[in-house]
């Protein structure tokens, strides 16, 4: 009974570490979406030339709003998933464009959530299918990048089997740490492409709903 109680007790330092990791992830994804989307916004507003100062100012002004957006996505998606997996998936797809709504339409978090449901109406399945393709490609590329890490892991494991049997930590040397770090950095950078793809999903949905001509404007800038 004592062993069970001790296993279920999480040390305070571990809880603090998990909380800090969660906050770091929220800040990271908020800043990533903010930088990429404000870059696109500046690119469109300045006819194909992004202004770094404009991007920095936009991210600074929207930081707390974007952070609140990240928290709202996490809470609503988690709540939907706990009720049943399908509601979680549905809400996740609906809110996939919320960062773009916050940045491009200057809406507050609550208004942005409402607008996402309006924006995706009658387009949920198409958006879902597009996101599936994007994330399949994303994870496929990540797997390719991680191949050197796995090869190194298995070669070292077989060549140092006797040493590792007495000291498992010997498997995780500087070579493994370096390859893992490179793969993680590439993974974070690659997520930029996911943000870009979701931004174009937003423009497509907005164009179909309101006929604003934004997609034609972007195409015309790209052809200059």
Predicted regions and their residues:
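Transmembrane-helix bundle segments that line or gate the permeation/cavity pathway
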Residues: 1-2, 31
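Juxtamembrane transition segments at transmembrane-helix termini in multipass membrane proteins
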Residues: 4, 37-45, 91-109, 119, ...
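Membrane-embedded or membrane-proximal helical elements that form or frame transporter/channel pores
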Residues: 4-28, 175-178
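Alpha-helical membrane-protein architecture signal
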Residues: 12-16, 52, 56, 60, ...
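Alpha-helical transmembrane segments of integral membrane proteins
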Residues: 20-28, 84, 182-190
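Hydrophobic, lipid-facing residues on alpha-helical transmembrane segments of integral membrane proteins
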Residues: 23, 27, 63-79, 128-140, ...
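Hydrophobic, aromatic-rich membrane-embedded alpha-helical segments
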Residues: 26, 30, 75-97
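Hydrophobic transmembrane alpha-helix segments characteristic of membrane transport
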Residues: 33-59
């Amino acid at each position: 009974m004592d062993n069970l109680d001790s296993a279920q007790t999480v040390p305070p330092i571990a809880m603090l570490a998990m909380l800090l990791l969660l906050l770091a992830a929220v800040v990271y994804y908020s800043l990533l979406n903010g930088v990429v989307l404000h870059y696109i916004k500046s690119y469109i507003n300045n006819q194909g030339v992004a202004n770094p100062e404009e991007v920095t100012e936009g991210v600074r002004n929207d930081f707390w709003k974007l952070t609140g957006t990240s928290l709202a996505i996490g809470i609503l998606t988690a709540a939907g998933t706990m009720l049943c997996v399908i509601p979680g998936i549905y809400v996740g797809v609906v809110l996939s464009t919320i960062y773009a709504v916050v940045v491009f339409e200057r809406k507050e978090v609550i208004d942005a959530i409402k607008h996402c449901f309006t924006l995706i109406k009658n387009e949920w399945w198409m958006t879902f299918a597009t996101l599936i393709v994007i994330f399949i490609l994303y994870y496929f590329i990540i797997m390719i990048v991680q191949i050197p890490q796995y090869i190194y892991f298995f070669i070292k494991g077989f060549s140092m089997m006797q040493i590792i049997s007495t000291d498992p930590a010997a498997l995780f040397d500087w070579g493994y740490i370096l390859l893992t770090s490179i793969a993680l950095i590439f993974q974070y950078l690659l997520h930029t492409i996911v943000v870009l793809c979701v931004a174009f999903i937003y423009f497509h949905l907005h164009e179909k709903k309101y006929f604003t001509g934004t997609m034609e404007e972007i195409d015309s800038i790209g052809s200059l």
